[in-house]
A protein has these predicted regions:
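C-terminal functional extensions of proteins
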Residues: 237-307
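Charged helix-capping and loop-helix junction motifs
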Residues: 207-215
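An anion/phosphate-binding loop that grips the pyrophosphate of nucleotide cofactors and donors
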Residues: 191-192
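A short helix->loop->beta-strand "cap" motif at the edges of active sites that frequently abuts
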Residues: 26-28, 220-225
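Active-site glycine-rich loop that binds ribose-phosphate moieties when present
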Residues: 168-188
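Electropositive, gly/pro-rich neighborhoods at or near active sites that engage anionic ligands
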Residues: 34-172
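A short, Lys/Arg-enriched amphipathic alpha-helix followed by its capping loop at the start of a domain
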Residues: 16-29
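Extreme N-terminal starter segment of soluble prokaryotic enzymes
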Residues: 1-6
Length: 307
């Protein structure tokens, strides 16, 4: 096969698909473009949750909870609580170390891409994981009372899926002035297939697409673009996808996913067919390594068959 398979990822669904795709195409043929609009600077660290999540999945470090590093300790968080610091964002010690090193590199003038590449190499990541851009882009959520930074909305305010204040608006501050990195543009142009992972379309994939020039780069690509639905039996497996789709005026269904990506994708992988779009009907629940590999393999085959 020529050219990489490019996966757009944010959150657990995209990371799982990336891990399955690694088994299918190998380390030299996989590039993951990760959402960085969830990034947060806290405790002196620069934390990039989605970028790190993908890296932890690819290196088989992911904790069974679905976030953080397996076997990590929380001594620093315990120490902060002991001196009455408001620890609302929980980070394991190894996870924090990565964020501190990223912050150090950024303070010394490295691009976000350069900083994460160095960290990925140190962790022996077997594929390329690229931030969507080097400039800061931040997701904000507006409720009735105020605008919230995304992490604060999800954790402190409870998030819509957990009974928190309903979403009234979402924006991606900085996206209009940000640009895809040269590395991202090269990967997209060279790709043999581009896959939008089964991530929350409104808050995980939309920030990537909102970066100025990203959608045009994808449109100009010669590769077919396939989205994998995050829904199983027309329902959300976990997380706030339903709440954000409802905010966006979309039905929580595969037709809603197809409508959201209308004009961008060439096909949809889902467990129930949609109308008016080439679709591959298959089980998209990726709860085992075998399932992750199967979904990745079938998705890639579908993309290549549409060329």
């Amino acid at each position: 096969m020529s050219g990489p398979v490019v996966v757009l990822a944010g959150g657990t669904g995209g990371a799982k698909l990336a891990r399955g795709m690694l088994d299918v195409v190998g380390s030299d043929s996989l590039v993951v473009i990760a959402n960085t609009a969830d990034d947060i600077e806290i405790y002196g660290a620069y934390v990039s949750p989605d970028t790190d999540l993908v890296t932890f999945w690819l290196t088989d470090r992911i904790d069974e909870r679905g976030w953080g590093i397996a076997g990590d300790t929380f001594h620093v968080m315990d120490g902060l609580r002991a001196i009455h610091v408001d620890v609302w964002f929980n980070l394991g010690d190894q996870d924090l170390a990565i964020g501190l090193e990223r912050a150090r590199r950024l303070q010394e003038g490295e691009r976000l891409t350069e900083a994460h590449t160095a960290i990925s190499k140190a962790l022996n990541a077997p594929a390329t994981v690229l931030p969507m851009c080097d400039e800061p882009v931040r997701t904000r959520v507006r409720t009735q009372d105020r605008w919230w930074p995304f992490q604060e909305y999800m954790i402190r305010a409870g998030g819509a899926a957990a009974g928190g204040d309903p979403v009234q608006d979402v924006d991606f501050r900085g996206a209009r002035t940000a640009r895809p990195t040269p590395e991202v543009l090269h990967a997209i142009a060279a790709a043999q297939a581009i896959v939008i992972g089964p991530s929350n379309p409104v808050i995980s994939i939309a920030p990537i697409l909102a970066v100025n020039g990203m959608r045009q780069a994808l449109t100009d690509a010669t590769a077919r673009i396939i989205a994998v639905s995050p829904l199983v039996a027309e329902a959300v497996v976990k997380g706030p996808t339903a709440a954000f789709m409802e905010f966006a005026g979309l039905p929580v269904s595969n037709d809603g996913i197809a409508a959201y990506y209308d004009g961008l994708i060439d096909g949809l992988v889902a467990d129930r067919r949609t109308h008016g779009l080439p679709a591959l009907e298959t089980d998209v629940l990726m709860d085992t390594p075998t399932a992750r590999r199967r979904v990745a393999e079938e998705t890639l085959g579908f993309a290549l068959a549409l060329r």
